[in-house]
A protein has these predicted regions:
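AlphaC helix of the eukaryotic protein kinase fold
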Residues: 64-86
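Conserved short submotifs of the Hanks-type protein kinase catalytic core
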Residues: 103-117, 121
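Activation-segment/catalytic-loop signature of the eukaryotic protein kinase fold
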Residues: 98
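Protein kinase glycine-rich loop
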Residues: 35-42, 46
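C-terminal lobe helix-coil module of Hanks-type protein kinase domains
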Residues: 137, 143-144, 159-162, 203-285
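Hydrophobic/aromatic scaffold residues of ePK-like serine/threonine protein kinase catalytic domains
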Residues: 86, 135-136
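Conserved N-lobe loop of protein kinases adjacent to the ATP-binding glycine-rich P-loop
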Residues: 50-57
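Activation segment of protein kinases
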Residues: 19, 69-72, 165-217, 245
Length: 285
């Protein structure tokens, strides 16, 4: 039996990759080669990848396996990718490409941020106050730019905030900058049931009261601002502002409980920081 030509093997490999979940070694559209997976979440799975033509690394997000067969969600995935692409902000992870061949898995291509997530950093302990304030200021700058374009994140959390390292910072310049991941993508899951049991959009510890109530129709930029206050508290303490382990108790705490005492003055932190957190997490009666 004659051996199959290399071109035939490549075509067969590409066709096989289209039928199964993406994995390391796959080549997409003769442009991107997948390497190791970087992580997964409610929207999809992310791989480190290599741009074969430009010879540079990138990151690729695929739609979640349980969502890929839903035509409506594929359309929403494309729409949200387009929204995120338009943002173009130094503190928002850049979207550089989007592909959606009906016979394949839809995916978007992002810049690869070298560094660690805020979650990884907080596992080592609280941040120094100047660093915490600077990172949250960079987050606020990104939010202002996005909100002006009508794009709301809705799922801000330490896992979605990357601390990108600066190769050669100048004198007095910081060696890390914050980059926001998944801008615009969390909205696409609004009202979607992945597990068959209803699903709240947002991470429990960081969701706003309206998200905790399930009032997705009134979620707006203020929900992101609430999350900034919760994140600033955690940056300074390495503890969650709403610490109940039970989901329902935490939800009720977010919806209506009095904001826990911050005691920042006792910890030697400026009173202004406490005022900022209190203002961000102010409930509307």
């Amino acid at each position: 039996m004659s051996e199959q030509p290399e071109s035939g093997k490549a075509a067969e490999s590409a066709h096989s990759a289209a039928r199964r979940a993406p994995s390391g070694g796959d080549v997409l559209d003769n442009i991107y080669r997948l390497d190791a997976p970087l992580g997964k979440g409610g929207v999809g799975v992310v791989f480190k990848a290599w741009h074969l033509h430009l010879q540079r690394p990138c990151a690729i997000k695929f739609l979640h396996p349980q969502l890929v067969s839903n035509p409506e969600l594929r359309t929403r995935f494309r729409r949200e990718a387009q929204s995120a692409f338009q943002l173009g902000h130094p503190h928002i992870v850049a979207i550089t490409d989007f592909r959606d061949d009906p016979s394949n898995w839809p995916y978007l291509v992002m810049e690869l941020v070298q560094g660690e997530s805020l979650r990884d950093r907080l596992e080592k302990g609280p941040l120094d106050p100047p660093l915490a304030v600077r990172l949250m200021s960079e987050l606020a700058d990104a939010l202002v730019a996005a909100h002006r374009r009508g794009v709301i994140h809705r799922d801000l959390k330490p896992e979605n905030l990357l601390l990108g390292t600066v190769d050669k910072p100048g004198p007095g310049e910081p060696d890390v900058h914050l980059k926001v991941l998944d801008f615009g993508l969390s909205k696409m899951l609004d009202g979607v049931e992945i597990t068959g049991s209803g699903r709240l959009v947002g991470s429990p510890s960081y969701m706003s009261p309206e998200q905790a109530r399930g009032d997705s129709h009134i979620v707006d930029a203020r929900s992101d601002i609430w999350s900034v206050g919760v994140l600033l508290y955690e940056c300074l303490t390495a503890d969650k502002l709403f610490s109940c382990e039970n989901f329902e108790q935490k939800r009720q705490q977010i919806i209506g409980a009095t904001l826990p005492p911050l005691h920042f003055t006792e910890k030697g932190l400026p009173p202004l920081i406490e005022k900022i957190i209190t203002r961000c997490c102010q409930r509307v009666p």
